[in-house]
Structure formats: C-alpha cells, structure tokens
C-alpha cells in the first residue's frame, strides 16, 4: 500500500517559514533598521534563521514530496506510516527547539542559564539528526528496491538519490558537531565558515539533486509528458563530478591559499551554474 501524500510535512514547512523564519528575520531587520546594538547574538540569529528556512521550509518540503513520489517511482509499497510520522515529529520538534533555545541563548551568554539553553540547541540538532537518519533509511530502501527497468540510461536517477543521502548525512552530522562545539566553547553561534560550508554542501548535494531526480521522473509520469530521451545517468555523473570537485577544492582552499585555485573554484562554480541552466532550458 503506497503512503498517502504526507501533507503535514508541507503544512509544517510553510508554518515554520512564516512563524519562525520571518519572525527571526524581522527581529534582525528591526535591529539593523533602527540602529540597535547587534551584539554577539547577530550571527546566532542569522544562522538560526537560515537553518529554519533551509531545513524547516526546504527540507520538510523535500521530505514530504520525496516520500510520496519516490515510493511510487520505485513501486515501493512497504512504507511504514508510523515511521513517516516519527520522522515528522522528530524534525518538527528539533526545529521548534532550535527556534526557541537559540533565539534566547545570546541574551544569557554570561548567565547560569547558558548551560541549559545551549544544551537545548544541542538537543534540537540531535532530534533533527534522528529524523534525518530515519528518512535516510527510507531513501536507502527506495534505492535498494528499484526495479531493473529503472536502470535504463534515460531513467536512472540513482546517482541523484545517493547524492541526496550524502547531503543529508553530512549536514546532520556536521550540524550536531558544530552545536556541541559551540556549547563546549561557550559561544552563542556556530563556527561561521563551517556552517556556511554545510549549507552549501546541503544545497549542492541534496536540494538540487532531488529536484533533478523528481523533475526527471515524476513530472513526465504524473503530468503525462513525453518521456526523457537523453542520457540521464551521464548527466547525473557529470553533475556529481563537478560538485565533488568544487567541494573538495573549496576544502583545500580553506587550509591552503593558492592563487590559481581561486580561479579553478570560480570556473567550476560557473560550470555548475551552466549545468543547472542547461537542465532548466532543456526540460522547459
């Protein structure tokens, strides 16, 4: 039995985007607009706002859509509704914890309450990581149950699904490590460079690939469009190689500054953009 469309994920993503994301964004804009002292909490608010939008809005939306469409694409009928509900509760609980505890943490930096509030941020990252873990188990089941008919070059989206899994894993583990380090070092925000790296990694490895995968397989199927005739597998491998190279060169550049490496990163970024534009133009 295929699962019903998990609309609760979509509803939660919209509510978090408007209730929590816009709430924090308004707070930051108000402080800047009226010239209030931003203080050490500025980066914390920016990071929390970004995380709520990325995981709360985009992430929950991706989860809801992929659970519905991917299970049907792979003819995977053994979806445990209780497991889907558990993923939802863990993700939403973690996001609410992040919003509440990280919003007020900067105001209690030198207070006895810092330990409790920072622990709340760590718990939020733990809950989100647990939700992502259960979601990844679902994705692995989907990849493992794909029928040979889906392995044709114009239908094979396994590389995109594997990239999606890698993106979720790295973001979940990385965010948990950064929050633990934040609490241990008595800070109110995550290490900026590594936080930005995780965001970029998640977008390049999870957001874009799942959009490619669902767009290539689900839209023609459900909208009764002509099937894809070009080599999807080759396209996915090209995208993976470009993104893998871009991420690794950025890591090297973080530790070792080389002039030509900057130009290479810039060139790979342009190539990545060209690949995305080609996909949009070719499938419009």
Describe the function of each predicted region:
Residues 1-284:
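Hydrophobic alpha-helical transmembrane segments of multi-pass integral membrane proteins
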């Amino acid at each position: 039995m295929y699962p019903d469309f998990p609309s609760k994920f979509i509803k939660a993503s919209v509510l978090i985007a408007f209730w929590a994301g816009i709430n924090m964004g308004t707070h930051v804009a108000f402080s800047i607009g009226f010239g209030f002292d931003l203080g050490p909490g500025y980066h914390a608010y920016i990071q929390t706002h970004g995380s709520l939008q990325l995981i709360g809005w985009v992430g929950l939306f991706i989860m809801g859509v992929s659970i519905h469409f991917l299970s049907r694409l792979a003819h995977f009928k053994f979806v445990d509704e209780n497991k889907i509900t558990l993923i939802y509760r863990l993700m939403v609980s973690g996001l609410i914890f992040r919003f509440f505890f990280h919003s007020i943490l900067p105001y209690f930096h030198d207070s006895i309450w810092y330990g409790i509030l920072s622990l709340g941020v760590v718990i939020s990252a733990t809950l989100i990581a647990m939700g992502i873990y259960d979601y990844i188990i679902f994705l692995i089941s989907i990849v493992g149950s794909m029928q040979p008919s889906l392995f044709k070059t114009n239908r094979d989206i396994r590389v995109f699904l594997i990239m999606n899994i890698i993106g979720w894993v790295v973001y979940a583990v990385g965010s948990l490590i950064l929050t633990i380090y934040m609490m241990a070092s008595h800070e109110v925000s995550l290490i900026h460079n590594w936080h930005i790296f995780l965001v970029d990694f998640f977008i390049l490895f999870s957001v874009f690939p799942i959009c490619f995968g669902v767009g290539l397989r689900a839209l023609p199927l459900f909208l009764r469009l002509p099937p894809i005739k070009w080599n999807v597998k080759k396209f996915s491998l090209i995208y993976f190689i470009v993104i893998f190279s871009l991420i690794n060169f950025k890591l090297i550049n973080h530790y070792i500054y080389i002039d030509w490496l900057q130009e290479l990163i810039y060139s790979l970024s342009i190539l990545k953009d060209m690949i995305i534009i080609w996909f949009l133009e070719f499938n419009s």
